[in-house]
Regions:
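ATP-dependent adenylation/nucleotidyltransferase module used to activate substrates
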Residues: 1-153
Length: 153
């Protein structure tokens, strides 16, 4: 078994092991946080391959590229699209500042509130940042599975 096949098998096994918890938390099973990017697309397909119960949700930011929205609607029509209560422009007016690297308030309002009370699947990679690398595959406090492809071999 090659490295990629091993990572896929590991991820599928982890999804299957945690499915009981996901179903206890929600009758829909996992809440898959979907962005249309390569990581969430890969995680979507891993969940399909695992045969686990999940529902994919995308939090629309109002600044998503039209090409991305067309891609999601055409290739992933089962993804539930959620519009924010307040759009990014109103949020900037309310905060009286643009989001910057040290003050990233926008995701807390537009994306991170989704999936509360569920086991949420996040397609993130350790290589993206030291903070993401420090995350565990399963975070019980938030009931989040990171979809890690970085397990020991």
């Amino acid at each position: 078994m090659g490295a990629l096949e091993h990572k896929i098998a590991y991820s599928i096994a982890l999804l299957r092991r945690a499915e009981t918890l996901a179903l206890r938390m929600s009758p829909d099973g996992y809440h898959l946080a979907f962005s249309g990017g390569k990581d969430s697309v890969a995680l979507y397909h891993l969940a399909k391959m695992a045969g686990v119960k999940f529902k994919a949700h995308m939090q629309i930011t109002n600044i998503d590229p039209p090409e991305l929205m067309r891609f999601v609607r055409s290739q992933y029509p089962d993804v539930v699209l959620h519009r924010p209560e307040i759009n990014i422009y109103k949020l900037i007016e309310k905060k009286k500042m643009l989001p910057i690297r040290t003050k990233r308030y926008c995701c807390a309002y537009l994306k991170e509130q989704a999936g509360g009370g569920t086991v949420t699947l996040l397609g993130i990679r350790a290589a993206e940042s030291p903070r993401r690398a420090a995350r565990n595959e399963v975070q019980i406090g938030n009931h989040r599975f990171s979809g890690s492809f970085d397990q020991p071999q």
